Amino acid sequence: MKIHQLSLFLENRPGQMTEPCRVLAAAGISIRTLTLADTQRFGILRLIVSDWQQARTQLEEAGYVVNITEVVAVEVSDRPGGLATMLELFDDRHINIEYMYAFTFSRDDRAVFIFRFDQPDAAIERLRAAGINVLEDVEVYHRITV
């Protein structure tokens, strides 16, 4: 199952992350995880939020251009080698990881990785065949808030 990620382009200068975070807070939308990648002139803020549709609406009304990308959330054992074992599944199928980021919890031994694959359906099929838990939007939200 694919989940929805919001991407915003921000100028690469101090203070640019504050306003989109304020917009989301004012709408009662929680940021579940994020990553910020920079280039010389701009940054790409990627967000997984509690309500992606409402977040998109609120951010667009505030003047932001919001791109929605389908990504794959995968639950992996938070132990040495957990990620390496999973990544091996993609090598022989030539499935490319365009980018990824992750978060962990202090209360259990699981990590959640967010992936952007060049072949998401093939990646999901491979993960499920290996018995790896591919999460849905609601599961990502639930695992972070419980």
Segments and roles (model prediction):
Residues M1-V146:
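A conserved regulatory-domain signal marking ACT and ACT-like small-molecule sensing domains
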